[in-house]
Amino acid sequence: MLTEFRLLQFFMTHPDFVYGRQHILDMVWGRDRYLDERTVNTYVRRLRNKLEAMSADVEFVSVRGVGYMFL
């Protein structure tokens, strides 16, 4: 849950920009940790589900071959 919060906080403070998975991993989890880039996919999916359940007026947009952006 804390990681989801940090991920959401990162995107909310950097809206409208596309970020690659590796950059997101470095900024949210730290550069000193080795995690698969698909970890980001899992956490973004969880946040998407929670935001949709709340009918939030924001969304994560997947940019194929690049990463994600938050609108």
Listing of model-derived features with the role each one plays in the protein:
Residues 2-42, 46, 50-59, 64:
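Positively charged, aromatic-enriched patches within helix-turn-helix-type DNA-binding elements
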